[in-house]
């Protein structure tokens, strides 16, 4: 697939600067590429071929090996959204993130939240067996990406003690609980729902049962 500049994704690596900007893990970089310098790393060639690329950015097909080749303190922001759950080498990835992040940079990490997944199984999918399995500590499964290896927010600090959690938000606390699909298409409903989601995103009782958690991490001050 060609980007807007007509450069094949695999050949862009030598042509883009990573002296500043954003590192995005996965294929969601297009959203952030407008007005930013973005480098994206995705191990799946198939996913890269299907990605949106109407904004120019550097797409690398690779995984942890690609991160190892990048210079220290290359990025102001690192985005890792719903990725670590599927990675076998999470601790190594986090150490690379720490190395690649500038001293005042931030790591934006979105992760599955086990209690929220249990809510989804019971309330939305009526699947009590999977809910019981999750409550017993078993992993989940995604048809697109495979096994979901759940982890706790605090595990990030255990795996890489140089990070600290600056902020924690709940994502999709209410949205999917509304099963009237016609509502989802209504812009007025969407606006009110987003306002409600934002209002409770940092309130612990609601955050605890959100489908996802959004962690903002930074380097500990030395």
What residues fall within each predicted segment?
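A short glycine-rich, Lys/Arg-flanked "PGG" loop and its adjoining helix->strand segment in the class I
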Residues: 91-106
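A short SAM/SAH-binding and catalytic strip from SAM-dependent methyltransferases
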Residues: 76-90
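Acceptor-substrate binding/catalytic loop of class I
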Residues: 138-155
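A C-terminal cap/extension of S-adenosyl-L-methionine-dependent methyltransferases
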Residues: 167-222
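A short acidic, Gly/Pro-enriched loop at the edge of an enzyme's catalytic core
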Residues: 68-78
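Conserved alpha-helix/loop element of class I SAM-dependent methyltransferases that forms part
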Residues: 1-15
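Conserved class I S-adenosyl-L-methionine
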Residues: 106-135
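Class I SAM-dependent methyltransferase SAM/SAH-binding core
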Residues: 15-18, 22-67
